[in-house]
């Protein structure tokens, strides 16, 4: 039995299959964890969604920002982004079932047995483990069983950009969603900056990656995340695993085998920027 993590798919189905073939993935014995953003700019978003769903208990994803945007478009809250290639999902006969399944995926996965945390963008620098898990559960409860339409309709905001345990209602839920699905750079006072998406060397001096801030949790439990394609080939602290290596940007897809921490990569098999 082996445990694998893979970076953002974003509709890059062929590369995922090549990686799974290379490691001889066996869904009856192995487990595949995905860091979110199953869909968006690649040409096989429907295939990615259907495949991960078909694996059942052999796979576990978390929600990424593109996954949430797909749900928002399904609810007629937002329009499909010009570069997103998701028409096949909307035309699928089981469209409602696919969106229902996606909406029931978590924001955070914690395994005590395997000793990891996984989310799409990372863990807020102001959260300990208990807070991260309770915040994730709070929003997951609404997405899965509550007034998810109202939440998704009102989640598009960059405020509040700083955590406080006193946050309530939509402000609190927006912060939680942004921390788990959109966070990259922060100011030294832990405020989020959503404008900068550049490589680390090109970032303004006042900004630092979330994982370089002082949070004891970052050293207590290994954290696996995606979301940040421009981190490709950048060093990260011990126990911080950044798996989005920009396959949909014509770079490569990265898979990590957890037991021996061996990486596997697959270059993009097509020029996605041509679409």
UniProtKB/Swiss-Prot annotation:
<dbReference type="InterPro" id="IPR004617">
    <property type="entry name" value="ApaH"/>
</dbReference>
<comment type="function">
    <text>Hydrolyzes diadenosine 5',5'''-P1,P4-tetraphosphate to yield ADP.</text>
</comment>
<dbReference type="InterPro" id="IPR004843">
    <property type="entry name" value="Calcineurin-like_PHP_ApaH"/>
</dbReference>
<dbReference type="Pfam" id="PF00149">
    <property type="entry name" value="Metallophos"/>
</dbReference>
<dbReference type="InterPro" id="IPR029052">
    <property type="entry name" value="Metallo-depent_PP-like"/>
</dbReference>
<comment type="similarity">
    <text>Belongs to the Ap4A hydrolase family.</text>
</comment>
<protein>
    <recommendedName>
        <fullName>Bis(5'-nucleosyl)-tetraphosphatase, symmetrical</fullName>
        <ecNumber>3.6.1.41</ecNumber>
    </recommendedName>
</protein>
<dbReference type="GO" id="GO:0008803">
    <property type="term" value="F:bis(5'-nucleosyl)-tetraphosphatase (symmetrical) activity"/>
</dbReference>
<keyword id="KW-0378">Hydrolase</keyword>
């Amino acid at each position: 039995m082996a445990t694998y993590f893979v970076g953002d798919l974003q509709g890059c189905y062929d590369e995922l299959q090549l990686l799974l073939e290379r490691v001889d993935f066996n869904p009856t014995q192995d487990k595949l964890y995905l860091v979110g953003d199953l869909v968006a700019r690649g040409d096989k978003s429907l295939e990615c969604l259907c495949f991960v769903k078909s694996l059942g208990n052999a796979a576990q994803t978390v929600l990424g920002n593109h996954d949430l945007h797909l749900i928002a478009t399904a609810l007629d809250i937002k329009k499909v982004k010009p570069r997103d290639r998701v028409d096949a999902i909307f035309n699928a006969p089981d469209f409602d079932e696919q969106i229902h399944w996606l909406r029931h995926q978590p924001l955070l996965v914690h395994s005590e047995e395997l000793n990891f945390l996984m989310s799409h963008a990372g863990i807020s620098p102001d959260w300990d483990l208990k807070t991260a898990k309770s915040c994730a559960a709070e929003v997951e409860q609404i997405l899965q069983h509550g007034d998810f339409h109202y939440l998704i309709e009102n989640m598009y905001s960059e405020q509040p950009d700083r955590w406080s345990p006193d946050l309530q209602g939509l402000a609190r839920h927006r912060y939680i969603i942004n921390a788990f699905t959109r966070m990259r750079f922060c100011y030294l006072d832990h405020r989020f900056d959503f404008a900068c998406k550049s490589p680390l060397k090109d970032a303004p001096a006042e900004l630092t990656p979330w994982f370089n801030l002082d949070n004891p949790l970052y050293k207590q439990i290994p954290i696996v995340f995606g979301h940040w394609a421009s981190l490709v080939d950048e060093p990260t602290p011990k126990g911080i695993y950044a798996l989005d290596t920009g396959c949909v940007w014509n770079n490569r897809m990265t898979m990590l085998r957890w037991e021996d921490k061996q990486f596997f990569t697959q270059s993009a098999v097509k020029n996605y920027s041509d679409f």
